[in-house]
């Protein structure tokens, strides 16, 4: 599948590795930086979703998304592990759940940019969760220099998903290097992070913004045990 991720915000918190590991299945290990696991609240706008060489899918090919993710190792692969992905379209949510085994959710989702402000919100309707909402508003700053942490959090070339018959699912993710900017929080409600089974994050987050990148996601395969 090809797509374009636009106006993406990377909002991350440190967690103790064992707190995140207990939410992962056998065969999937939390990846760490500076001794910590990292969990992100990541809003963006998905545009141009479709198949290579064809026109983008009408209606279902463009929508806002807010996901909660961490970083893992499985076999000899390193990638993103999605704890939830909220969108406002039923069809792509169901297709992704079946085809890629990743936990898409459906509800009212908003993601807009006005000048240097980026604002996102989630009110989840399906499946139900104790904490079903999130709000995030940031002000975009100057271009940010690349460093080891920003590369750890953003330079990920695959996704790992729920095992099938005991083997984790892997799909390659290809995109250019991110153009990253500093960003400051104006408003934050991380309820969907708590809904994933984690303690509510109270520490100051690490925040970055990018105008976006074109993305190609390959077909899912099963990793060897």
Task: List each language-model region with its residue ranges.
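Internal, well-folded beta-alpha domain core
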Residues: 8, 67-225
